[in-house]
Amino acid sequence: MTKRYNNANEAYEAVLDEILQHGIDFGDTKAIFNCGFYIDNPSDKLITNQERNWSQNYASAEWYWYLSGDPSVDKLSELYGRVPPIWDRMADNRGEVNSNYGYQWKRNNQLSYVVNKLRDNPDTRQAAISIYDAKEHDKYSKDTPCTYAVQFSIINNKLCMSVYMRSNDVWYGFCNDQYQFASLQEMVADMLSIETGWYYHHAHNMHLYNNKL
């Protein structure tokens, strides 16, 4: 049975515990595979676990960076005051990254496409955004997007969303990723004048780096 959690923090703590108990050694991580679960209240997206010491200020800056659609890490620095080391390492020689998901969902007007599809037909199965793009493989030498796709459905007049990822680090990645995707879900629901429903999160490889064990 697919697991369900009330909010993001509950999901984080449960998945972290599962990795610690059942994860296998995989490179420089402990990992579990095909990890999928529902978050029933995705708007409850703050990570309150004290050991994690998660920063809403950073997550909010990252969200506005995504909204800008600007893949430059300089834009993130403008919003947050500095560039976190992980983004510095992933930036290409132009100072740009492929994992600015806002840049990806604006590509080919994908976000507008999704909203229009849902407005035209609430029962559509075509309201999907592609993040990973095989046509961009030559750009993925330093930064390969962790997310494949995001799909939306209106169920009982609520906007439900599924996120599919090739890889997700529970400590750094999931805590911020779920915040960004839940914010996207809220934004699309607002455009459609409906409430949000569940958020389903699936990672082929969900892991914790060994330096966090």
At which residue positions do the language-model features occur?
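Terminal, non-catalytic protein-protein interaction segments that mediate quaternary/complex assembly
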Residues: 1-213
